[in-house]
Amino acid sequence: MLPNEVFLSHSSQDQDFVARLVETLRRHGVPVWYSQTNILAAQQWHDEIGQALRRCDWFLLVLSPSAVESMWVKRELTYALQQNRFENRIVPLLHQSCDFDRLSWVLASFQFVDFQQSFDEGCRELLRLGGLGYQPGR
């Protein structure tokens, strides 16, 4: 069931997709921790990320070629995989085809939510996890 708060791990190069996803999730009542809106000027961003990872109870991972190359995405995922509270609460979101094994071979065992063909269908599937329902344009 979605969530008290979800952590959204992503590459900054996927900003357009991620901003659209965050807006959609928030419109559907899902509280999202997202670095672009949750880290304020003059804050220590690495400390803020760490605090959010410790606080959030779901981990959404946006997968793309740039995410696979991101040191921070890899660090965030490694942390999430080590936390019991994220068991069955790590959801890979396939934004673009990529070699996700480079992040972690464990990802092959997860059920992905595929956004490659349709953003709306991807959102519908993701929100179904929490029984929140999805209404395009909401």
Predicted regions and their residues:
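Glycine-rich, charge-decorated loop segments at or immediately adjacent to ligand/cofactor-binding or catalytic sites
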Residues: 98-109
